[in-house]
From Swiss-Prot:
Main location: cytoplasm
Subunit record text: Forms oligomers.
Database matches in NCBIfam families: division/cell wall cluster transcriptional repressor MraZ
HAMAP family, per the entry: MraZ
Name of the featured protein: Transcriptional regulator MraZ
Taxonomic placement: Bacteria, Pseudomonadati, Pseudomonadota, Betaproteobacteria, Burkholderiales
Organism of this sequence: Cupriavidus pinatubonensis (strain JMP 134 / LMG 1197)
Keywords recorded for this protein, A-Z: Cytoplasm, DNA-binding, Repeat, Transcription, Transcription regulation
SpoVT-AbrB domain sequence ranges: 5-51, 77-120
One GO BP annotation of this record: negative regulation of DNA-templated transcription initiation
CDD domains, per the entry: MraZ_C, MraZ_N
Origin: domain of life: Bacteria
Family (UniProt): Belongs to the MraZ family.
Subcellular location: Cytoplasm, Nucleoid
Keyword Chaperone (UniProt): no
Length: 142
């Protein structure tokens, strides 16, 4: 399970260094192989390959009225491998789709990660907190 937020920088080639606390798990779970794709909220999803295969099967099984969402998730997917330094290359098309420049946030979301432009994430987080908790969380015990 992946959790926690990491403020990271992309290098000049568009590579993101995976924090050391997640590298070993990605090596064990997926031999360093990951898949990146677009998310409708404006970030990227980063899956260990076995988790991606499960997600891909669920998306592929969606009915025809979700055909555009299949295109968005599956058509934009890029399989990549961590290099020896624990970096992942994010393709220019995916960097552009998520408006990733230099400063990014990597968020552990359980079985996968989200990759956000740092400024976009900060603005969306502030907006969500200003709106208050959704009904589903109002009776949640912290």
């Amino acid at each position: 399970m992946f959790q926690g937020a990491s403020a990271l920088s992309l290098d000049a080639k568009g590579r993101m260094s995976i924090p050391s606390r997640h590298r070993e798990a990605l090596q064990q779970q997926a031999e360093g192989r990951v898949t990146l794709t677009k998310h409708p909220d404006g970030c990227l999803l980063l899956f260990p390959r076995p988790e991606w295969e499960s997600f891909r099967q669920r998306i592929a099984a969606l009915p025809m009225d979700a055909h555009w969402w299949k295109r968005i998730f599956l058509g934009n997917a890029a399989d990549v491998e961590m290099d020896g330094a624990g970096r992942v290359l994010i393709a220019p098309e995916l960097r552009g789709a998520a408006m990733l420049d230099k400063e990014v946030m990597l968020l552990g979301m359980g079985s996968h990660f989200e990759v956000w432009d740092a400024a976009t994430y900060a603005a969306k987080e502030q907006q969500a907190m200003a709106q208050g908790m959704p009904e589903a969380l109002k009776n949640f015990s912290f």
